[in-house]
């Protein structure tokens, strides 16, 4: 009978361990297990090192019983490991055979099939039973035994595509990655009842070509814009983030909104003009101007095209523009951008009530046309399921009555005090009031002191102006407008009050000199109205490449 030695402090549990006093095992169970693995017929004597006596002593009966039980467990574990290793080897052999088989599969187009009709995805939905070819980016990719499912995206829509047979087994198919570009050939089939996919159809692929293979592994698309990434990192990767479902949907709704706004303006007989973006005048105050050197002279990026639009009234009638405006505001709120798409209009020979009705018509009809759009309408429902289209007439609420309402509802100003006439209603209080009332509001007749110098005073109360902010529940202000001063003396007094040198504004002042008229206008931030339509937390999600303080890339 052999003897084996165990020393917990310095022993090693390995099959190569000698089990001598110089090279002992760590545990009794492993000593028995190692002995049996070497086919020893008889159980060895076990000697365990006792630290307190500083010598090896024969193992006790109870400890030996425990060691035998532990040895049985090690044997079962060893058998299981061998089985797993065998399965692993078999799997590797199968995979190697599959890979070899996959490498031998050549993807060829069957020339006996009808010629494929080149089509965009959105148009393919109506081509059931026809063989088509569509090109795009792999938006989703999953495998199911011997079938590969691909959701293809081309900007016009999405289509589910099915690859089966040799196409699904080919190595070229197994190497496909998200965002790879491909051209797929196949037959459009209608989905059976109970199944859903974009357009209610799918493409049974019979042949395809790889146009550009996107990287996998660490450089894969999903690693670049991982869900939950820091917003600043996602903004750095904006060019990739735009491929996502939500952002691309917002951009499509944006396009439909601008198209709808132009449609309403056409119906209302407004003419589109394109005023300059480089100017030497200000509209909204000098502190938010982006200054630049213009051939040795000081110039600015436009804050608003209002002044130029006013000059067009005498020649073109009612006019509008849709172009970028710039505000150098070091504001990091979710409602501000340094560059935004500004919808602006000026209208002649109208009253303040006429102006309000015009703004009402523009908003109601534009939203209606977006919701009726076959692409944008479903996207709004997808992004904002609870959206309710606004209906005319909007609630009219004068500034003085809003002050009363805020105080009655114990909503304080920024100093924590009750509101008083002349206070500027800050965003937080305005939002709380709007959300509580719960309907679109025309907030009107603001005090002269808190509005721009060019706004016309009310004839029945010269303390206030014929001005309006349009407030929407859950968003706040989306539009601001007013009647403009049409009297030259009153306008000059406004310039003087603001300390503005009138020399650079001669062309604007001339509008009152050479045939003045009652007129008014407004500006709408496209990104704000989109945030309302699409239920976005920040206007940054509503701009293609948002620009704000600290962000001017990519």
Swiss-Prot record:
GO terms for molecular function: asparagine-tRNA ligase activity; ATP binding; sequence-specific mRNA binding. Its main location: cytoplasm. Gene3D superfamilies: asparaginyl-tRNA synthetase, N-terminal domain (3.30.1910.20), Bira Bifunctional Protein, Domain 2 (3.30.930.10), Nucleic acid-binding proteins (2.40.50.140). It is an enzyme of class 6 (ligase). InterPro entries: Aa-tRNA-synt_II (IPR004364), aa-tRNA-synth_II (IPR006195), aa-tRNA-synth_II/BPL/LPL (IPR045864), Asn-tRNA-ligase (IPR004522), AsnRS_N (IPR048952), Asp/Asn-tRNA-synth_IIb (IPR002312), NA-bd_OB-fold (IPR012340), NA-bd_OB_tRNA (IPR004365). One of its GO terms (cellular component) is cytoplasm. Belongs to the class-II aminoacyl-tRNA synthetase family. This is Asparagine--tRNA ligase, cytoplasmic. It comes from Saccharomyces cerevisiae (strain ATCC 204508 / S288c) (Baker's yeast).
């Amino acid at each position: 009978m052999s003897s084996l030695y165990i020393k917990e402090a310095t022993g090693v549990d390995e099959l190569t361990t000698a089990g001598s006093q110089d090279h002992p095992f760590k545990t009794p169970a492993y000593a028995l297990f190692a002995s049996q693995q070497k086919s020893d017929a008889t159980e060895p004597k076990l000697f365990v090192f006792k630290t307190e006596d500083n010598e090896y002593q024969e193992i006790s009966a109870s400890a030996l019983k425990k060691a035998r039980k532990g040895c049985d467990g090690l044997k079962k574990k060893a058998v299981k490991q061998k089985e797993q290793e065998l399965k692993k080897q078999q799997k590797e052999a199968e995979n190697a055979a599959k890979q070899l088989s996959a490498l031998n599969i050549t993807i060829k187009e069957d020339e006996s099939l009808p010629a494929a009709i080149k089509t965009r995805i959105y148009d393919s939905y109506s081509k059931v039973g026809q063989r088509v070819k569509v090109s795009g980016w792999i938006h989703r990719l999953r495998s199911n035994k011997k079938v590969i499912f691909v959701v293809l995206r081309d900007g016009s829509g999405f289509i589910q595509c099915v690859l089966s047979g040799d196409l699904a087994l080919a190595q070229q198919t197994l190497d496909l990655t998200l965002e790879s570009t491909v051209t797929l050939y196949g037959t459009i089939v209608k989905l059976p009842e109970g199944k859903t996919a974009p357009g209610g159809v799918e493409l049974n692929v019979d042949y395809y070509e790889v146009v550009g293979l996107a990287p996998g592994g660490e450089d894969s698309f999903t690693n670049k814009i991982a869900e939950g990434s820091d917003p600043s990192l996602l903004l750095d990767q904006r060019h990739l983030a735009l491929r996502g479902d939500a952002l691309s949907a917002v951009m499509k709704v944006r396009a439909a909104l601008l198209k709808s706004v132009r449609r309403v303006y056409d119906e209302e007989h407004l003419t589109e003009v394109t005023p300059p973006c480089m100017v030497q005048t200000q509209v909204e105050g000098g502190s938010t101007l982006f200054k630049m050197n213009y051939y040795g002279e000081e110039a600015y990026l436009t804050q608003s095209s209002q002044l130029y639009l006013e000059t067009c009234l005498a020649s073109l009638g009612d006019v509008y523009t849709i172009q970028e405006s710039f505000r150098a505001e070091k504001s990091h709120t979710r409602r501000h951008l340094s560059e935004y798409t500004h919808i602006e209009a000026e209208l002649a020979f109208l009253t303040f009530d006429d102006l309000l009705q015009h703004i009402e018509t523009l908003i109601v009809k534009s939203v209606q046309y977006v919701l009726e759009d076959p692409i944008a309408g479903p996207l709004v429902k997808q992004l904002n399921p609870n959206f309710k289209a606004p209906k005319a007439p909007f609630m009219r609420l004068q500034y003085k009555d809003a002050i009363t309402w805020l105080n009655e509802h114990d909503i304080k100003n920024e100093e924590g005090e009750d509101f008083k006439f002349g206070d500027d209603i800050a965003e937080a209080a305005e939002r709380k009031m709007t959300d509580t009332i719960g309907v679109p509001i025309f907030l009107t007749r603001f005090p002269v002191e808190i509005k721009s110098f060019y706004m016309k005073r009310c004839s029945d109360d010269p303390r206030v102006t014929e001005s309006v902010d349009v407030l929407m529940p859950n968003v706040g202000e989306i539009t601001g407008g007013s009647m403009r001063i049409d009297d030259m003396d009153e306008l000059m007094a406004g310039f003087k009050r603001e300390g503005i040198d009138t020399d650079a504004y001669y062309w604007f002042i001339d509008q009152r000199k050479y045939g003045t008229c009652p007129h008014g206008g407004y500006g709408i931030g496209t990104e704000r109205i989109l945030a309302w339509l699409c239920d976005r937390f920040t206007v940054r999600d509503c701009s293609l490449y948002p620009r704000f303080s600290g962000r001017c890339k990519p």
